[in-house]
C-alpha cells in the first residue's frame, strides 16, 4: 500500500506545477480534447492472492479528459480469476470489477508517446453460477460479493497508427494494483450441493496484482 500510495503522491506533486501552465501548453501542443479506448488485460497474482487466486483476464475501458500533458484518467475493468464447470450444464465464475480515477501525465509528440498515471477507486469481488444447458430455471445466479477500495499506479507506451481528425494508437502498458483487505471466494472455492445450491468457501486477504494491458486508444478532437 505504501509503494502505490507514494506513487499516487509523487505523480500528484509532479503534475501540480503543470496545472498553471495548462493553457500555455495547449497553445504549443494541441493534443485535442482527450481520448478513450479499450484494452485486453491479463493480471498476475501476487502475495496472498497467488495462493488463493489464479491468473486473471478480462477487459478495461478508459477515458482521458485532455490531449495535453496533464489530464484526468478514468478507467473501469472487469476480469475473471476462476472459472469452473460443475457438471450437468452448471458453471461458476469468480470475478473482479474495478473503477478508479486519477492524474495522468503524457510526454512526447508524434508517433511515440509515454504516459504514467495513478488512480484511486473501488472494486467488487463477486461470484456467479450459470445454469445454461442444464434444464434449470433461470440464467445466472449471484452467489457472493464484497466491496473494497483499490489503488493503482502504472504507465505505458502509445504507438500512433494514424493522425487526422481521429488519431488512433496502440496502447501497451502495465500497472501495479492493490485491493485493500476483502473477503472473496478463492479459486476452486465454490462447491455444488446435492440439492443444486452452492457452498462458498471464503478467505479474507489483501489482493495484489501486476496487470498487463494491450489495446487501442482513440483521440477526440
Which residues are covered by each model-predicted region?
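Cleavable N-terminal export/targeting peptides
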Residues: 1-31
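Short glycine/proline- and aromatic-enriched beta-strand/turn motifs that initiate or cap beta-hairpins
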Residues: 20-68, 72, 78-81, 86, ...
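Predominantly the C-terminal beta-signal and adjacent terminal strand-loop region
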Residues: 160-221
Amino acid at each position: 500500500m505504501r509503494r502505490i500510495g507514494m506513487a499516487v503522491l509523487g505523480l500528484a506533486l509532479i503534475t501540480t506545477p503543470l496545472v498553471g501552465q495548462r493553457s500555455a501548453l495547449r497553445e504549443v501542443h494541441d493534443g485535442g480534447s482527450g481520448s478513450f479506448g479499450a484494452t485486453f488485460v491479463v493480471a498476475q497474482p501476487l502475495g496472498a492472492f497467488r495462493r488463493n487466486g489464479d491468473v486473471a483476464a478480462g477487459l478495461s475501458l478508459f477515458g482521458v479528459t485532455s490531449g495535453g500533458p496533464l489530464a484526468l484518467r478514468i478507467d473501469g475493468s472487469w476480469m475473471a480469476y476462476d472459472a469452473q464447470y460443475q457438471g450437468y450444464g452448471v458453471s461458476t465464475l469468480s470475478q473482479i470489477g474495478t473503477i478508479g480515477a486519477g492524474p495522468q501525465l503524457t510526454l512526447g509528440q508524434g508517433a511515440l508517446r509515454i504516459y504514467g498515471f495513478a488512480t484511486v477507486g473501488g472494486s467488487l469481488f463477486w461470484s456467479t453460477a450459470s445454469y445454461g444447458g442444464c434444464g434449470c430455471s433461470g440464467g445466472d445466479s449471484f452467489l457472493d460479493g464484497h466491496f473494497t477500495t483499490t489503488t493503482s499506479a502504472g504507465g505505458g507506451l502509445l504507438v500512433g497508427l494514424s493522425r487526422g481528425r481521429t488519431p488512433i494508437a496502440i496502447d501497451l502498458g502495465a500497472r501495479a494494483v492493490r485491493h485493500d483487505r476483502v473477503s472473496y471466494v478463492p479459486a476452486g472455492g465454490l462447491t455444488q450441493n446435492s440439492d443444486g445450491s452452492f457452498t462458498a468457501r471464503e478467505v479474507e486477504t489483501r489482493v495484489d496484482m501486476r496487470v498487463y494491458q494491450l489495446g487501442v486508444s482513440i483521440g477526440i478532437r
